[in-house]
Amino acid sequence: MIAFVRGQVAAVTLSSAVLEVGGVGLDIMCTPGTLATLRVGQQAALPTSMVVREDSLTLFGFADEDEKQTFELLQTASGVGPKLAQAMLAVLSTDDLRLAITGDDVKTLTRVPGIGQKGAQRIILELRDRIGAPTGAGRSAGVPAPAGAVWRDQVHQGLVGLGWPVRDAEKAVAAVAPEAGDVPDVAALLRAALRTLSKA
């Protein structure tokens, strides 16, 4: 329906961005890693996927076309809706997902809140032959995020959005703070925070 959106970034929240297109503000749901690349007042272009429900129209935005295609493929697996597919992309890069699914890595998939062992096994069974090999162009290198407290808010909101309690999210953010460095990488920090929560 809407393959991509190009326009000026009007606002960035902890879970979405508003892009102004022809005088209309489109609210687009994005992962923390994608949101970290956007700056208010600057132009941006996001590949998008529209999810139509009886009572809602939701636009999801992505860092690149590969992430969008992976999002849409994930939803073809039983029990995987758009929110869970986005959660998977928030926790794992597209290549990490490909490696986990083609390598029968249940443990990696169960890092995503909402995916248990049986769910991970079902995803592997249904997508193993369709997801393809790693491309080497995923988010492994990370995306620089704004300095200061902004990355903390993004990681915290990402964890809460994935279903973790506020108190647990706060502890996880505090635990990964020493890893932030001078140029924090929101996607990497979110994955690190999820690892600390899965060990708790």
UniProtKB/Swiss-Prot annotation:
Keywords: Cytoplasm, DNA damage, DNA recombination, DNA repair, DNA-binding. It comes from the Bacteria. One of its GO terms (biological process) is DNA repair. The keyword DNA repair applies. Residues 64-142 are annotated as: Domain II. This is Holliday junction branch migration complex subunit RuvA. Homotetramer. Forms an RuvA(8)-RuvB(12)-Holliday junction (HJ) complex. HJ DNA is sandwiched between 2 RuvA tetramers; dsDNA enters through RuvA and exits via RuvB. An RuvB hexamer assembles on each DNA strand where it exits the tetramer. Each RuvB hexamer is contacted by two RuvA subunits (via domain III) on 2 adjacent RuvB subunits; this complex drives branch migration. In the full resolvosome a probable DNA-RuvA(4)-RuvB(12)-RuvC(2) complex forms which resolves the HJ. GO terms for molecular function: ATP binding; four-way junction DNA binding; four-way junction helicase activity. One of its GO terms (cellular component) is cytoplasm. Has three domains with a flexible linker between the domains II and III and assumes an 'L' shape. Domain III is highly mobile and contacts RuvB. Belongs to the RuvA family. Residues 147-200 are annotated as: Domain III. Residues 1-63 are annotated as: Domain I. Residues 142-146 are annotated as: Flexible linker. Its main location: cytoplasm. The RuvA-RuvB-RuvC complex processes Holliday junction (HJ) DNA during genetic recombination and DNA repair, while the RuvA-RuvB complex plays an important role in the rescue of blocked DNA replication forks via replication fork reversal (RFR). RuvA specifically binds to HJ cruciform DNA, conferring on it an open structure. The RuvB hexamer acts as an ATP-dependent pump, pulling dsDNA into and through the RuvAB complex. HJ branch migration allows RuvC to scan DNA until it finds its consensus sequence, where it cleaves and resolves the cruciform DNA. InterPro entries: DNA_helicase_Holl-junc_RuvA_I, Hlx-hairpin-Hlx_DNA-bd_motif, NA-bd_OB-fold, RuvA, RuvA_2-like, RuvA_C, RuvA_C_sf. It is found in: Cytoplasm.
